[in-house]
């Protein structure tokens, strides 16, 4: 009777072990599917984030292009202003000692007026600020000389 009881207990333990292993396998399979679903969601989010980053970069690139154009326009305006300001040397900006002051033109420091440029020919500028020619003469006086 003791051996029958031992066989019965061993059989029950074997069945219990079989059921436990099947439940564990099913749980493992479900956990694997859950992990796979999580990865699919994460991948979808990463793809969406990648597209959002790409769109953000496209917007940023557009803004940079726009900013570059604005900078270019500003430089064109600045260049235009510099071109328009060429040769203007205001009396109040003079430093003296014949130094070049302002944008363009040559100031020879003739503060008393009526002096010919050091080139000796061409225009006689009241304050000595003129534009020299390539031949050595004075082409014209600076605009503030006309006032």
UniProtKB/Swiss-Prot annotation:
Query: Which Gene Ontology BP terms does the record give?
Result: nodulation
Q: Which PANTHER family match?
A: NODULIN-24 (PTHR37389:SF40)
Which segment of the chain is annotated as a signal peptide? 1-25
InterPro entries (alphabetical): GRP
Q: Where are the sequence repeats?
A: 31-48, 49-66, 67-84, 85-92
Q: Which GO terms describe its cellular component?
A: peribacteroid membrane
Per the record's keyword annotation, is Repeat included, yes or no?
Answer: yes
What the record says about family reads: Belongs to the GRP family.
Q: What induces it?
A: During nodulation in legume roots after Rhizobium infection.
- Protein name, UniProt field: Nodulin-24
Subcellular localization is given as:
Symbiosome, Peribacteroid membrane
Q: From which source organism is this entry?
A: Glycine max
Region annotation (3.5 X 18 AA tandem repeats) ranges: 31-92
Alphabetically list the UniProt keywords.
Membrane, Nodulation, Repeat, Signal
């Amino acid at each position: 009777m003791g051996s029958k009881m031992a066989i019965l207990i061993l059989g029950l333990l074997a069945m219990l072990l079989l059921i436990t292993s099947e439940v564990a396998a099913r749980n493992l399979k479900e956990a694997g599917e859950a992990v796979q679903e999580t990865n699919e969601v994460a991948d979808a989010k990463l793809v969406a984030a990648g597209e959002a980053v790409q769109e953000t970069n496209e917007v940023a690139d557009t803004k940079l292009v726009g900013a570059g154009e604005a900078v270019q326009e500003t430089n064109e305006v600045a260049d235009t202003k510099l071109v328009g300001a060429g040769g203007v040397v205001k009396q109040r900006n003079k430093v003296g000692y014949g130094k070049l002051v302002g944008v363009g033109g040559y100031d020879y420091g003739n503060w008393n007026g009526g002096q010919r440029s050091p080139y000796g020919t061409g225009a006689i500028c009241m304050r000595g600020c003129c534009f020299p020619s390539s031949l050595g003469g004075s082409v014209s006086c600076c605009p503030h000389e006309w006032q």
